[in-house]
Design a protein with these regions (language model features):
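A compositional/biophysical signature of low hydrophobicity enriched in polar/charged and small residues
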Residues: 2-91
């Protein structure tokens, strides 16, 4: 999940760690796990690696923090190495 702070999010950036802690708990309730988190410099302000049981659970999780108005998200689905090898092997 690629994230950028909104103007509102930048104004309250000191609260960002608290919001992240709440997001981690929210992920767990939805059977998801925030595996990694990075603050970045460049096009995106933050990157989080979310593991979810299915696309629906991931979508529900992603929409919840975004509703607060502090971040905008861009999602992408990644394939682990074993899945990558399976896909390429089937070509």
């Amino acid at each position: 999940m690629l994230m950028n702070w909104t103007d509102q999010g930048v104004k309250s950036v000191k609260d960002s760690p608290k919001r992240f802690d709440a997001a981690r708990k929210l992920a767990q309730k939805g059977a998801c796990e925030l595996r990694d988190f990075y603050m970045t410099i460049g096009k995106h302000d933050m990157i989080a690696v979310l593991e979810a049981p299915d696309d629906e659970a991931a979508a529900k999780f992603v929409l919840s923090p975004a509703r607060g108005g502090n971040i905008r998200t861009t999602t992408l689905k990644a394939f682990r190495e074993d899945a990558y090898r399976k896909v390429i092997g089937a070509l």
